[in-house]
Swiss-Prot record:
Name of the featured protein: Adenylosuccinate synthetase
Residues that, per the record, bind Mg(2+): D13, G40
Keyword line: Cytoplasm, GTP-binding, Ligase, Magnesium, Metal-binding, Nucleotide-binding, Purine biosynthesis
UniProt cofactor note: Binds 1 Mg(2+) ion per subunit.
Highest taxon listed in the record's lineage: Bacteria
Originating species: Beijerinckia indica subsp. indica (strain ATCC 9039 / DSM 1715 / NCIMB 8712)
Location(s) in or outside the cell: Cytoplasm
Record pathway: Purine metabolism; AMP biosynthesis via de novo pathway; AMP from IMP: step 1/2
HAMAP family: Adenylosucc_synth
Amino acid sequence: MANVVVVGAQWGDEGKGKIVDWLSIEADIVVRFQGGHNAGHTLVIGNQVYKLALLPSGIVRLGKLSVIGNGVVVDPQHLVEEIAKLAAQGIEITPDNLKIAENVPLILGLHRELDAHRESSTVEGVKIGTTKRGIGPAYEDKVGRRAIRLMDLAEPDTLDEKIVRLLAHHEPLRRGLGLEPISAGAIRAELESLAPKILPFMDATWDLLENARRAGKRILFEGAQGALLDIDHGTYPFVTSSNTVAANAATGSGLGPKAIGYVLGIAKAYTTRVGGGPFPTELLDETGQLIGDRGHEYGVNTGRRRRCGWFDAVLVRQTVKTCGIDGIALTKLDILDGFKEIKVCVGYDLDGRRIDRLPASQSAQARVKPIYETIDGWEGTTAGARSWADLPAQAIKYVRRIEELIEAPVALLSTSPERADTILVHDPFRD
């Protein structure tokens, strides 16, 4: 059996939570390997709705081990709050079903403050459209080798020197930005108050996962955001601060590349994006408004309305290649029910020349214009379909055309937020 990596094939918000929950029934372990609590997702199980941001989706399933890998940045305050919120919904979270890598960097109050300050800036190019949760600044400190990591809370005698090293960078930065000074004592007090609540979950997760892999356990790697937000392969600088492509499932969990088996990309049947940055197929008319209203396109964490547009086969084909995607889970097909015509982007016009990929240049990305292929819509409904026989013939044609354009098969088809409303074409764990 293959281990499975789930990644977003667009700009995030593709419906990964439902698909991961659906796959977690077969998994023994579910691992988050990058990002932080900036990637909210909603799970609908029976009559219960769970809203997660940091914890792996497997946490709501009995008998599953959830792991937060070293590639994640953890806000300890948010972690405690999310655990408490789930506990109020009847989900018990203990060190038996949740493990956190000992070397995860921590998000502190100063990171959140810095992030929010940057996003409120009126200087051109400074505002990216982040969730203001401190993710980027925390990754900056990780790369700058000054981060406070979870294991540091277990060694209070060495904590002061690490805080001093952290502030050696942040104090002059804060002065330059006009922010109030922050004391080492305040940071230490913040960490000491949270340490007893989160240290019990600490483990050498790389070792735990490797032993599980060798024992034949099925591991599901849960990506956050989407491949087009990857710090290297995304629409830079309008990206997140981590690698969101599938290869980072290994690095971000402490395993070797052979641990990755089947790569499942998640894509909506249309396209959405939150925040700034290029969006070639964006619809600024009533059609875009209609798609957003039907799809309830609002961020789980922020409540921000998502930008909406037609399916961009060029971008998804690009992420199929950068992520090594074996199959696609196509979600929200039902949102397109009733459209007389549906457009799919099959190429770009850049200064009068046709191209078949998104250029890396920021200025070129802003100039590309979509080249559309128009496909007949369907009158019947796809909502709640659980087999191909339940789908209108034209809806099937739409799916098949997408497969051709992105050069990857559709392995799963989601037709509503309910986990049972899923058409399985190929089981990723059986690869």
